[in-house]
Swiss-Prot record:
Any Pfam family matching the protein: Hist_deacetyl
Molecular-function GO term, any one: histone deacetylase activity
UniProt cross-references to CDD domains, sorted A to Z: HDAC_classIV
SUPFAM superfamilies: Arginase/deacetylase (SSF52768)
Alphabetical keyword list: Hydrolase
Lineage: Bacteria, Bacillati, Cyanobacteriota, Cyanophyceae, Oscillatoriophycideae
Function: Putative deacetylase.
InterPro entries: HDAC_classIV, HDAC_PDAC, His_deacetylse, His_deacetylse_dom, His_deacetylse_dom_sf, Ureohydrolase_dom_sf
Entry protein name: Uncharacterized protein SYNPCC7002_A1628
Family note: Belongs to the histone deacetylase family.
Gene Ontology biological process terms from the UniProt entry: epigenetic regulation of gene expression
Length: 300
């Protein structure tokens, strides 16, 4: 059987049609992977909702309560950038459960991919940039607490710095945060990851991949992680509305293949999330996200 893929219909919930967050992409990605034969139905696992205690390994209890009950201040809700509804709460919790399950499956099978996740702008006490709960951080702490893995490497290649994740783990020697992002982009105030690589605007495939290849192997041998989380944001694409870099589909596929094959060849299990992407055409965007799963199929 192929590598495990995590999906739940609750990854999608209605929000206003004109909203720039591409909510339908999760359902469309799952559909495209099946339609193109990248995955088979028996590879798909469905997550459960996470325990409240797991959320509170990262987030302040008052924040979790206020968000789930819809009692955040208007300012705090605006900072998140998504409208509040019971459906968005369910979607948020389900995606966190999905990343936790993806991590478990990666430890069992060597590689697993979520069809959502990567909410790296969420801080312990507030959400930001379409990110409400930090799934990467919650999954990391949950996996550690359950004794499944201790040393964690987070490879964040979304075009925006993983500021929430960096902040959460800034004093934690068991978690190494690596963010490679466009320097002149959201968030304007960066946090300090264990390794930050701020890239110039307009960087193309070859320039990008050269920098990544130069650092990745050394990083793995330095950190020696029990588990790698990989945030494969596709907003590095030249056609992305919020990206400012100049990667192509070919470059994205080469990137995914480089990360996965380097980790697997060295014997490190990888749990993947899809991260950000903001193309005008949602079908173009969904195809870009599918390159992660296509690369996973090809290296597994």
């Amino acid at each position: 059987m192929g590598f495990p893929v995590v999906y739940h219909p609750d990854y999608v919930t209605p929000i206003p049609e004109e909203h720039r967050f591409p909510m339908p992409k999760f359902r469309l990605l799952h559909g495209l992977l099946l339609e193109d034969g990248v995955i088979q139905p028996e590879q798909v696992y469905q997550p459960q909702l996470p325990d409240r205690a797991w959320l509170e390994l990262v987030h302040e209890p008052d924040y979790v309560t206020a968000y789930c009950q819809g009692t955040l201040t208007p300012k705090a809700q605006r900072r998140i950038g998504l409208p509040w509804s019971a459906g968005v709460v369910q979607r948020t919790l389900t995606a966190v459960g999905g990343t936790i399950l993806t991590a478990q499956l990666a430890l069992e099978h060597g590689l697993a991919c979520n069809t959502a996740g990567g909410t790296h702008h969420a801080f312990p006490g507030y959400g930001s940039g379409f990110c409400i709960l930090n799934d990467l951080a919650i999954a990391t702490r949950t996996i550690q607490q359950r004794g499944l893995a201790q040393r964690i490497l987070i490879v964040d290649l979304d075009v925006h710095q993983g500021d929430g994740t960096a902040f959460i783990f800034q004093d934690d020697p068991t978690v190494f945060t690596f963010s490679m992002h466009c320097e002149v982009n959201f968030p304007s105030q960066k946090q300090r990851s264990d390794l930050d690589l701020g890239l110039p605007e307009g960087l193309d495939d070859d320039g990008y991949l050269q920098i990544l290849a130069h650092h990745l192997e050394d990083l793995l041998s330095q950190v020696k992680p029990d588990l790698v989380f990989y945030d494969a944001g596709v907003d590095t694409h030249v056609g992305d509305r919020l990206g400012k870099l100049a990667m192509t589909n070919t470059g994205l596929y080469r990137r995914e293949r480089l990360v996965l094959s380097t980790c697997l060849a060295a014997g490190y299990p990888v749990a993947c999330v899809i991260g950000g992407g903001y193309a005008k055409n949602i079908h173009d965007l969904v195809y870009r996200h599918s390159l992660l799963h296509r690369a996973a199929r090809d290296v597994y």
